[in-house]
Swiss-Prot record:
Catalysed transformations (reactions): a 3'-end 2',3'-cyclophospho-ribonucleotide-RNA + H2O = a 3'-end 2'-phospho-ribonucleotide-RNA + H(+)
Domain of life: Archaea
Protein name: RNA 2',3'-cyclic phosphodiesterase
Motif, HXTX 1: chain positions: 39-42
Organism phylogeny: Archaea, Methanobacteriati, Methanobacteriota, Archaeoglobi, Archaeoglobales
Length: 176
């Protein structure tokens, strides 16, 4: 099973993000993220055998944190707006989200999981399959937009089920 650890976004944030999702959906070569799939990935685990699931859950239950606020501001692209592969909304935080991601990683590192890159807080809103100059226009248009604030009260172990129509994400366990 394909697993990752994430923070889901509140419905209020989903609503505020819908206009950019709609615009991205209208751009050739871009796949916008479905509103119900919006999340902040703390750690991607990849393909994991079911026999490891209990140990992953046990380690994640050891992660402790207090609820904290994050805000969503600005739009950018990885690696850059001129050659975008991923379109994202920035996540402003005071370090708590990064500490949570690092704590998740430290617990799961003991089970052999590795990061492919350092954690950079962001909310993916689209994936670019084919280069299209319209993407840079959208990034510019929303570059200083504010999408609201939410409180992080939990994180989730999620399964990603890949289908021809796009991924389906299923919560396996919620950690508070």
């Amino acid at each position: 099973m394909r697993l990752f650890v994430a923070v889901d976004v509140d419905d209020s944030i989903r609503e505020k993000v819908k206009p950019i999702l709609k615009e991205l959906s209208g751009v050739s070569g871009v796949k916008a993220v479905e509103p119900e799939n919006l999340h902040i990935t703390l750690l991607f685990l990849g393909e994991v055998g079911e026999e490891k699931l209990a140990r992953i859950e046990e380690r994640l239950s050891e992660v402790t944190f207090q609820p904290f606020k994050i805000s969503f501001e600005g739009v950018g692209a990885f690696p850059n707006p001129g050659s975008p592969r991923v379109v994202w909304i920035g996540v402003k935080e005071e370090g708590e989200l990064t500490r949570l991601a690092n704590s998740v990683y430290e617990k799961l590192k003991k089970l052999g999981f590795r990061r492919d890159k350092d954690f950079k807080a962001h909310l993916t809103v689209g994936r670019v399959k084919r280069k299209n100059p319209e993407v840079a226009d959208i990034v510019r248009k929303y570059s200083s937009e504010s999408f609201g604030e939410m409180e992080v009260r939990d994180f989730r172990l999620k399964q990603s089920i890949l289908t021809p129509k796009g991924p389906i994400y299923k919560d396996l366990r919620v950690f508070e």
